[in-house]
Amino acid sequence: MATKNNTVEKEYSVIIRNSSRELSAKEKIAFRDFGNAIKLDENLSDDDSMLIAPADYVILDVHNEKAKGNKDYTKYVIIDTAGNKYVTGSESFFTRFIEIFETMAEDAPDEEYQIECYKKPSKNYAGKSFISCSLV
């Protein structure tokens, strides 16, 4: 930690902005650490997909002084029913995910389901892909 004008500045910090439910202290610590999470952006290719049975999610606000470009960014962590963590910074993925998650939680809270995560070519940016998900 660096000090400046007698205040402590953190070079790296993670704050939980929101979560799908109230978290215990242990869960708060565990979910803020996404270093051991499966990175959706890196583990999906244009040719395959991944199935996740979501149980919870956490939205994290990250500050990283050493980041190239934007030092403040958001990470979305999805926790599956087996306790595995998946992380992405993709707004398009999380927008679709939260629509599915909230609808299922409200209209069918006891129904088990999975989401299929996949990459799609961007229509707006040639040669670029984005990740999204669908209910299966």
Which residue stretches match the model-derived regions?
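Short, charged beta-turn/beta-strand-edge "cap" motif at the junction between a beta-strand
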Residues: 106-107, 116-136
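GIY-YIG-like beta-to-alpha core
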Residues: 86-99
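Short nucleic-acid-contacting surface segments enriched for D/E, G, S/T with interspersed K/R
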Residues: 96-116
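OB-fold ssDNA-binding interfaces and closely related basic DNA-contact patches used
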Residues: 1-83, 124, 132-136
